[in-house]
C-alpha cells in the first residue's frame, strides 16, 4: 500500500499515456481506411470517395454512422459466445503490441525485456480470431477461410520468428529499445537485409494483406471468415486490419530502420515519417500485386522465405563469430 501511494503519480501518468496512444492508434487506423481508398483511386485512375465533405474529408464520419446503425445480427445457427469474442480478439491482439514500441528515447509505455517475444505471441493470437470466427459462424465459406488462415500461419510463423533472430543476435537483446540504440551507426536493414525482406513478407501475411489475403478472398470465398458479420462486429475486424498495418510498420521501423534515430529533425518526427513510408508501401503492394493461388503462397513460404531466413541467420552467426 505504501508503494502504491509513493508511485501513484507514475501509475496515473502511465495510464493516461496508454489511453492516449491507444485512442490515437484507433483513430489513425480509421483514417487510414479513407487514405487507402483515396490512394487506390489515384493508382487506378478513378476518383474514390469524394462526395461527403470537402474532397471526401468526412467520409469516415459517414462510414461510422452507417456501421453503428446497421443491424448487429447474430446468426441463430452460430456459436454465439465465440462468434462475439472473435472480433474483440482481432481488434485487441496487435493493438496490445503498441505500448511496447518506443516512439522516442524518452517516450515508451512499457519497455519489456522480452518485447520481441511478446510481439510474436500476440501475432500468433490474432490467428485465433480468424479461426474462431470461421468455426463459430457455422458457414462453409467462413470455415474455409479459417482453415486457410491456419495453414497459412504454419508457413509464415516459422520465418516470422527466425527473421528477427538475426536482429536479436546482432544487438544482444530482446528489448526493442536496446535494438534501436544498437543502430546508432548503421541501420539493421543493411547487415540484415534478408531478415528485413522476410519480415516484411511475413508482416503482410500477419496483416492478411494483399497478396496474402487468402482467408478473405472475395472472389473465391465471398469475404471468407467474416461473411456472417455485420455492424460493429464487422467494424472491429475492419479496424483491426489497419491497426495491424500500423503495428507492423512501427516494428519494421524500430527493428530495421533505426526507430527515432535520424539527423536534424526531432526523433518523433523521424519515427512518424518512416511509419508513413511503410504504410504507403503496404497500400502500393495492394494496388500493384495480384492475389496468387493458395498453394503458390504456401510453396513461396516454405521454398523461398524459410531458406532465405536460415541463410540470413547463419550468415549473421558467422559474422558475429568472425
Curated annotation (Swiss-Prot):
Reactions catalysed, as given in the entry: a quinone + NADH + 5 H(+)(in) = a quinol + NAD(+) + 4 H(+)(out)
Q: Which GO terms describe its molecular function?
A: NADH dehydrogenase activity; oxidoreductase activity, acting on NAD(P)H, quinone or similar compound as acceptor; quinone binding
- Predominant localisation class: membrane
Which keywords are on file for this protein? Cell membrane, Membrane, NAD, Quinone, Translocase, Transmembrane, Transmembrane helix, Ubiquinone
Q: What class of enzyme is it?
A: translocase
Q: Which residues cross the membrane?
A: 15-35, 50-69, 81-101, 114-134, 149-169, 186-206, 237-257, 265-285, 302-322
- Any idea where this protein resides? Cell membrane
Its record classes its membrane topology as: Multi-pass membrane protein
GO BP term, example: aerobic respiration
Q: Which GO terms describe its cellular component?
A: plasma membrane
Q: What is its EC number?
A: 7.1.1.-
Pfam families of this UniProt entry?
Answer: NADHdh (PF00146)
What is the protein's known function?
A: NDH-1 shuttles electrons from NADH, via FMN and iron-sulfur (Fe-S) centers, to quinones in the respiratory chain. The immediate electron acceptor for the enzyme in this species is believed to be ubiquinone. Couples the redox reaction to proton translocation (for every two electrons transferred, four hydrogen ions are translocated across the cytoplasmic membrane), and thus conserves the redox energy in a proton gradient. This subunit may bind ubiquinone.
Sequence similarity? Belongs to the complex I subunit 1 family.
Subunit-level organization:
NDH-1 is composed of 13 different subunits. Subunits NuoA, H, J, K, L, M, N constitute the membrane sector of the complex.
Question: Which NCBIfam families does the entry mention?
Answer: PRK06076.1-1, PRK06076.1-2
- The name under which this protein is listed is NADH-quinone oxidoreductase subunit H
- Give the taxonomic lineage as stored in the record: Bacteria, Pseudomonadati, Pseudomonadota, Gammaproteobacteria, Enterobacterales
Gene name per UniProt: nuoH
Amino acid at each position: 500500500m505504501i508503494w502504491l501511494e509513493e508511485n501513484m503519480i507514475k501509475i496515473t501518468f502511465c495510464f493516461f499515456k496508454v489511453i492516449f496512444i491507444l485512442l490515437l492508434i484507433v483513430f489513425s487506423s480509421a483514417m487510414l481506411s479513407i487514405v487507402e481508398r483515396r490512394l487506390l483511386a489515384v493508382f487506378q485512375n478513378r476518383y474514390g470517395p469524394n462526395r461527403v465533405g470537402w474532397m471526401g474529408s468526412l467520409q469516415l464520419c459517414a462510414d461510422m454512422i452507417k456501421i453503428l446503425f446497421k443491424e448487429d445480427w447474430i446468426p441463430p445457427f452460430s456459436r454465439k459466445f465465440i462468434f462475439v469474442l472473435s472480433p474483440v480478439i482481432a481488434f485487441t491482439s496487435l493493438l496490445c503490441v503498441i505500448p511496447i514500441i518506443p516512439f522516442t528515447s524518452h517516450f515508451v509505455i512499457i519497455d519489456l525485456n522480452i518485447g520481441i517475444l511478446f510481439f510474436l505471441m500476440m501475432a500468433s493470437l490474432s490467428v485465433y480470431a480468424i479461426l474462431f470466427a470461421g468455426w463459430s459462424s457455422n458457414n462453409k465459406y467462413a470455415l474455409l477461410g479459417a482453415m486457410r488462415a491456419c495453414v497459412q500461419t504454419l508457413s509464415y510463423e516459422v520465418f516470422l520468428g527466425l527473421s528477427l533472430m538475426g536482429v536479436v543476435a546482432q544487438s544482444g537483446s530482446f528489448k526493442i529499445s536496446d535494438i534501436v540504440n544498437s543502430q546508432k551507426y548503421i541501420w539493421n536493414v543493411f547487415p540484415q537485409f534478408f531478415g528485413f525482406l522476410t519480415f516484411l513478407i511475413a508482416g503482410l501475411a500477419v496483416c492478411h494483406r494483399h497478396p496474402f489475403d487468402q482467408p478473405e478472398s472475395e472472389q473465391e470465398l465471398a469475404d471468407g471468415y467474416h461473411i456472417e458479420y455485420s455492424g460493429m462486429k464487422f467494424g472491429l475486424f475492419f479496424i483491426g486490419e489497419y491497426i495491424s498495418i500500423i503495428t507492423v510498420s512501427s516494428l519494421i521501423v524500430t527493428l530495421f530502420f533505426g526507430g527515432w534515430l535520424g539527423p536534424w529533425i526531432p526523433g518523433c518526427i523521424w519515427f512518424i515519417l518512416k511509419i508513413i513510408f511503410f504504410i504507403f508501401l503496404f497500400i502500393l503492394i495492394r494496388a500493384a500485386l495480384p492475389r496468387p493461388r493458395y498453394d503458390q503462397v504456401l510453396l513461396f513460404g516454405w521454398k523461398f522465405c524459410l531458406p532465405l531466413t536460415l541463410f540470413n541467420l547463419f550468415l549473421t552467426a558467422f559474422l558475429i563469430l568472425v
